[in-house]
């Protein structure tokens, strides 16, 4: 029975909590006292307890450290009149059908058709470190990095078990949660909904910050008031999507980039997802994130277990920027498995925007030679290199036939790649590296693969198979499709000197044959990602989905870089990259200099401006044909490369401070500070010319107030001066930019 706590139980809880709070500073990351639990980070506390009567898990606190020696306020205040008390409770795992009419975290359909659940606490265990999720991407860490609490719950009426796993990364004020559901009964059940994380916050005045967009305009910030009732967003596309990102933040109305409280939530998943925020009638706000229930309905037989993806929640008292830096550092160090996560990225040139499908071995080798002569270190051959019977000379044929086109590469792809990697990079002892584009999850009907295996394409019975970009999606939920992809790419990567792979995905899933296909597809895709990235650890993997359609933590587990957007216009990219950095580290962002007028916006900006914007991404490069560039621009490329190589280590490993936002200012700016604080680089932009007005003063952040900093090797100022008084620069005309280096003096 759920209801108000008895006076005896409330007194017991308060007494236990008082003792728990008094020892916070000396406590381990996870403290357990009786049936009260506390996860303690450097600047966060997450607390809940077991209700004595209902055996439900009741939330006590998620926010700053609770260091008061007294007691917590009552969980439920005095009640007057006839009220449904469950609507006032802060529940950790809200179920369905027993009087809590708010958004549930779990919805299970039993064999008899019942959808009521009654999960009660049974036991718990604490482990050092963090177990990996089976078949799903997940954060990782050793015993000194992370601790884990597993709470075992059970529904005695349906014989269904739920294990709630909480992990705490104290250094990053990050709580990670996932749920396992196990059918312990004799009949089948169906999981209709399972949120990875659901939390009730005892405040009702929030703004919600999220990332919205579409193709070529991903990652745009949206801040809106959390109003009464339910609101949310998600994806039903079969991938995380351009339209929304599996991330949101709840912030107070007064929270800014650098001040105020921010709760951030991020789902480690690549498929369709759902975010739900509900402002209730009793002063609570419920927030939940997980797999989209419209694409779940997962059958679970006796003895079977379903695992949710994990969700990451961080808390910051230093504004939205503080929240972002916690995500950045956690994901760089405890999510991305690749050794390239924090390594300097070689400057690359991608063939796509320069040549498209129109090339042969001679033109490609010439472009590679031009690249090497300019000092570029990695040449990437994009779409169009494959297909024997159905050559990929346009987007209507060849996908799925991963063999080199013999007409384009008569000596064979391995020998051609060997010719490319023999090229000497100018002003360097290096030879040119080679990268290759794939779209392994797709198939053209005009291909040998489709003609041999039409059943491998996702389809729903006799319904027409909808084409997008002249292609269909392979059913990666099938083990034979997974094996085909692994074998096809392994054959190519094992027989040629390929150091980089761009993995593309250019459409969503249509005509799914059953609701749970999306989740099954993701399990198969993660198996493919894990197998290939483990088998070829010396390959740099970069994800892409028509740009940033799959920029999510699930992909980042295996691929250290993701192409941020197909929009390479520098002005648009400032907003896209600033927005994406709300949760994702700039080290993961692919950002390139393309030709002008820009292919997406037709805007013309200087090559310096384009390059400075792109340098804010960890994977910096070019998408153009050097031979078609103006000579003045071409002459600047060696200097741009030298600057990019100087900037890149700070961007890849450092902390980002967004000083001025593109949606709020004509002068957006970001400061990157190295982890040891010894160096910093400032990116400062003017969008439109400033007429008859004073130049803005930019105050820096994140510096050591007592230290001295040399600015571009010239003047020296204290950190206090730079943060409290600031810098002032003169800009010239539209689309001007500055890159400024700061060096801490010892």
UniProtKB/Swiss-Prot annotation:
Gene Ontology biological-process entries: carbohydrate catabolic process
Predominant cellular place of this UniProt entry's protein: secreted
Signal sequence annotation: 1-26
Catalysed reaction, written as an equation: Hydrolysis of terminal, non-reducing alpha-D-galactose residues in alpha-D-galactosides, including galactose oligosaccharides, galactomannans and galactolipids
Domain of life assignment: Eukaryota
pH-linked activity: Optimum pH is 3.5-4.5.
Subcellular localization: Secreted
Statement: the UniProt record of this protein carries the keyword Transport: no
InterPro entries per the UniProt record, alphabetical: Aldolase_TIM, Alpga-gal_N_sf, Alpha-glycosidase_related, Glyco_hydro_27/36_CS, Glyco_hydro_36, Glyco_hydro_36_C, Glyco_hydro_36_N, Glyco_hydro_b
Protein name: Alpha-galactosidase 2
Species, as recorded: Hypocrea jecorina (Trichoderma reesei)
Gene: agl2
């Amino acid at each position: 029975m759920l209801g108000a706590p008895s006076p005896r139980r409330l007194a017991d809880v308060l007494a236990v909590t008082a003792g728990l709070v008094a020892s916070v500073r000396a406590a381990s990351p996870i403290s357990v006292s009786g049936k009260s639990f506390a996860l303690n980070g450097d600047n966060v506390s997450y607390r809940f307890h077991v209700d004595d009567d209902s055996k439900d898990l009741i939330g006590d606190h998620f926010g700053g450290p609770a260091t008061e020696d007294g007691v917590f306020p009552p969980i439920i205040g005095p009640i007057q009149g006839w009220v449904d008390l469950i609507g006032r409770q802060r529940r950790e795992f809200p179920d369905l059908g027993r009087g809590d009419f708010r958004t549930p975290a779990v919805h299970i359909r039993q064999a008899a058709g019942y959808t009521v659940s009654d999960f009660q606490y049974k036991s718990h265990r604490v482990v050092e470190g963090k177990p990996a999720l089976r078949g799903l991407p997940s954060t990782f860490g050793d015993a000194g990095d992370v601790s884990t609490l597993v709470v075992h719950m059970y529904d005695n009426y349906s014989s269904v078990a739920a294990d709630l796993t909480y992990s705490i990364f104290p250094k990053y004020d990050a709580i990670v949660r996932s749920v396992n559901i196990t059918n312990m009964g004799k009949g089948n059940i169906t999981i209709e909904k399972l949120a990875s994380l659901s939390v009730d916050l005892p405040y009702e005045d929030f703004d919600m910050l999220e990332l919205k967009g579409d193709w070529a305009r991903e990652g745009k910030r949206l801040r809106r008031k959390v109003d009464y009732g339910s609101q949310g967003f998600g994806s039903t596309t079969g991938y995380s999507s351009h339209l929304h990102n599996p991330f949101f933040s709840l912030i107070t109305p007064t929270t800014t980039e650098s001040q105020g409280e921010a709760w951030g939530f991020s789902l480690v998943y690549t498929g369709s997802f759902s975010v739900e925020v509900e402002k209730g009638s009793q002063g609570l706000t419920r927030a939940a994130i997980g797999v989209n229930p419209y694409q779940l309905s997962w059958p679970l037989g006796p003895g079977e277990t379903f695992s949710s993806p994990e969700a990451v929640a961080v808390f910051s008292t230093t504004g939205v920027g503080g929240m972002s830096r916690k995500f950045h550092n956690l994901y760089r160090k405890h999510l991305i498995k690749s050794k390239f996560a924090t390594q300097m990225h070689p400057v690359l040139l991608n063939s796509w925007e320069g040549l498209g499908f129109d090339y042969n071995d001679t033109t490609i080798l010439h472009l590679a030679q031009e690249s090497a002569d300019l000092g570029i270190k990695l040449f990437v051959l994009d779409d169009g290199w494959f297909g024997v019977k159905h050559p990929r000379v346009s987007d209507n044929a060849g996908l799925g036939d991963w063999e080199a086109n013999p007409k384009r590469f008569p000596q064979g792809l391995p020998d051609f790649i060997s010719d490319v990697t023999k090229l000497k990079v100018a002003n360097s002892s290096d030879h040119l590296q080679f990268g290759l584009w794939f779209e392994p999850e797709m198939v053209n009907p005009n291909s040998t693969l489709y003609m041999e295996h039409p059943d491998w394409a996702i389809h729903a019975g006799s319904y027409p198979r909808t084409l997008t970009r002249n292609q269909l999606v392979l059913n990666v939920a099938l083990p034979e499709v997974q094996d085909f992809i692994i074998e096809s790419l392994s054959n190519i990567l094992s027989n040629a000197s390929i150091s980089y792979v761009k993995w593309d995905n250019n459409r969503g899933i249509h005509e799914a044959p059953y609701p749970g296909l999306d989740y099954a597809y993701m399990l198969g895709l993660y198996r493919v990602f894990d197998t290939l990235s483990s088998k070829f650890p010396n390959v740099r993997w970069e994800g892409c989905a028509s740009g940033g359609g799959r920029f999510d933590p699930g992909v980042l587990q295996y691929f250290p870089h993701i192409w941020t957007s197909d929009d390479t216009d520098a002005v648009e990219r400032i907003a896209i990259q600033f927005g994406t950095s709300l949760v994702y580290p700039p080290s993961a962002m692919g950002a390139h200099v393309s030709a002008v007028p820009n292919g997406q916006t037709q805007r013309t900006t200087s090559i310096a401006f384009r390059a400075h914007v792109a340098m804010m991404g960890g994977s910096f490069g070019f998408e153009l044909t050097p031979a078609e560039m103006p000579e003045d621009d071409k002459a600047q490329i060696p200097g741009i490369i030298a600057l990019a190589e100087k900037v890149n280590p700070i961007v890849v490993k450092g902390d980002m401070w967004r000083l001025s936002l593109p949606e709020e200012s004509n002068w957006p700016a970001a400061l990157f500070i190295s982890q040891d604080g010894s160096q910093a680089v400032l990116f400062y932009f003017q969008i439109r010319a400033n007429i008859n007005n004073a130049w803005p003063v930019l105050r820096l952040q994140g510096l050591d107030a007592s230290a001295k900093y040399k600015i571009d090797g010239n003047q020296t100022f204290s950190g206090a001066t730079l943060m409290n008084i600031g810098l002032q620069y003169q800009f010239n005309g539209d689309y001007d930019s500055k890159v400024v280096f700061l060096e801490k003096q010892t």
